[in-house]
Amino acid sequence: MTNPSAGTLTIERKQSHVELCLHANVAFSGKTTGFERFYFEHNALPEIAFAEIDCSTTFLGRHIGAPLMVSSMTGGYSEASTLNRQLAEAAEHFQIPLGVGSMRQTLESPLHRESFAVTRKYAPTTLLFANIGAPEVAQGLSQSDVAMMLDLLRADGLIVHLNAAQELFQPEGNTNFHRVLEEIHNLCATTNVPIIVKEVGNGIGAAVAEQLMEAGVQALDVAGAGGISWQKVEEYRFLQQFGHEHRFSSNALDELLNWGIPTTNCLLDIAELKRLQPQFQQIEIIASGGVSSGMDVAKSLAMGAQLAASARHLLHALHAGTLTATIEQWLNDLKAAMFLTGAATVDALRTKSLLNH
């Protein structure tokens, strides 16, 4: 499935994505994650010691150091090797899961495959996930394609990202989303590692979640609205290439750039779906999309998530040289919420009440 010219275009796009996420205003505006609308009921008698709080938990049957995941970011170009090495080192240090960026480029060309493989070298024992996009899945991945991606990382699972809004705005985007669900079902049936399906910042609602659960996925990452808008990232790229926006009316553009379901809406709706349909209880939920602190992580757990994930905030911390310190702060945020609700363990925190402002 290699195509060297397509691989070169993908490399250039990946470099541009990282630069824009670091330096451009690509966050949602006028729409938030919704985390700020909720607060924990304070427990004036926690009856636990802060020093004894245990943040460890499980994900897909594996023990992890904390309910936090380094979300899919990048790979597939030379500079990505350094970024992924540093992310992998942090994930290994804290024993938290790590997802790599889209591996489409590895299907198009063998160039820069090492930028993905480096993650397992520096994260030899923690959970590590390969990643491919819905447009590639829709075309029908061969078993050799899937095996190559998994073997390159010695991956513990495969993430399929749903990015319809991003593809719509991307100058070279692929907007043919026929057969995505069918091919996800095929992947679940033929792949011997867990399949995780995630959005990229527009959210997964209950109806789509039900379809994906029925297809056989083992985890869903809601990746709701309120964090990074990939429409805005691609709009920047479009304007750089063409100078002005002629595809959409000015009256609709702002709504399209901020299109999506807020993260907390996704979490609460899917929690209700799982409550009403017990056959889905074992499917684990990842909260992402604007997660910006350990308090957001704590609230996510109380809303039914197994863990939370972050990409852009951790990328900024990595760029600033503060990745380890930032994760440590987030874990202290989480422990503070646990202490003040009387939850000595992550499972205990899941039972605590959230109140709505």
Swiss-Prot record:
Binding site for Mg(2+): E167
A GO molecular function held by the record: magnesium ion binding
S-S bonds: none
Record field: catalytic activity: isopentenyl diphosphate = dimethylallyl diphosphate
Cofactors: FMN; NADPH; Mg(2+)
Highest taxon above the source species: Bacteria
Pfam families, per the entry: FMN_dh (PF01070)
CDD domains: IDI-2_FMN (cd02811)
GO CC entries: cytoplasm
Localisation: Cytoplasm
Main location: cytoplasm
Enzyme class: isomerase
Keyword NADP listed: yes
Protein keywords: Cytoplasm, Flavoprotein, FMN, Isomerase, Isoprene biosynthesis, Magnesium, Metal-binding, NADP
Documented EC number(s): 5.3.3.2
Assembly mode: Homooctamer. Dimer of tetramers.
Similarity comment text for this entry: Belongs to the IPP isomerase type 2 family.
Described purpose of this protein according to its UniProt entry: Involved in the biosynthesis of isoprenoids. Catalyzes the 1,3-allylic rearrangement of the homoallylic substrate isopentenyl (IPP) to its allylic isomer, dimethylallyl diphosphate (DMAPP).
NCBIfam families, per the entry: IPP_isom_2
Protein name as annotated: Isopentenyl-diphosphate delta-isomerase
Annotated organism of origin: Chlorobium chlorochromatii (strain CaD3)
